[in-house]
């Protein structure tokens, strides 16, 4: 057939009108952890949240722990977006988040005592988010005991019911917020089935079905005014008036269910893909993606950790950095910064800039090492091994740099940092090929030095 069919003419429309150009709309700014969590994401989010209109959580549950210091007060957030502190912004819990309702209100109470006000007027919850039941939390603990007995090791779960809830979701037996708010008899029947299903797997699991349902009915009325159709809410946010929208990632790249150090991972996607699926937004609405990385590495629980320092260096980092988990209170394992991991996290997330936190913890060191490559059987490997046994065997190639041996906690701009600290930062930038936008030298908002 010769010629071009009119229907293929991209510029015309039936009737000869021009096709409307698709407007992408507002873009979201994303903050993600680039290691095993505890990088200081809350602090970066807090900086950006001060002039954001909407702050979103897209995955995870109250297994995350974000600490934010405002006017000398320390707030701890687990389920809430840490932007809930901003009285001018809306906080949104997306469909990818799993919600333990008692945990949500407990967290609200604790932070209200510290000065958080009117949070219920600024919180919106997606109707498609899944519910963490009390028995999911009990099962989480029982599974950990079972793993310990069978394999002699455990995953190091927070016992917040996150894994079992995502399991229910994937096996299509989960309960969502929209189910809780519609026909309660239908919800109760499904709740009972789900509880019995878990009891058939764990003979010693006790579930107070009536008691839990009574509690859930009470929470249903409390959250009803906050629940919206999340897809429409996000679409309106993206395509309405210009808005600054911030997405706060929980957990981190190396804890991602697909890309993390499996099986010692969490049960959701904590990389950039989780933003689209956890909020119901298209990829073209992703704007800047900021990776948050500590100037050294930490990990909670077991699993391979190539740059771990089980020596005085590790102890010094643990003590100086106050490395205890916000959610679990467990001591964190410590080691040198691993640029193989950071490069891998960048490959998946496409970071547009980095936030380098806790630089001040390195102030006292004579020499600072950075992992730059892995060797396996004496040969350099150009990838990050997926298999845990192989990752356990890699030897790390280090680059050593002289320490700056002076206090950086008073630095407020780039010029205030000692030359050797500047060199360390530039080394990280050049190795990864991503600029460092912030450098953290202390706990407060003011101690995040903005470089551009």
From Swiss-Prot:
GO terms for biological process: 'de novo' AMP biosynthetic process. The keyword GTP-binding applies. The keyword Hydrolase does not apply. It is found in: Cytoplasm. Residues 1-22 are annotated as: Disordered. Pfam families: Adenylsucc_synt. One of its GO terms (cellular component) is cytoplasm. HAMAP family: Adenylosucc_synth, Adenylosucc_synth_vert_basic. This is Adenylosuccinate synthetase isozyme 1.
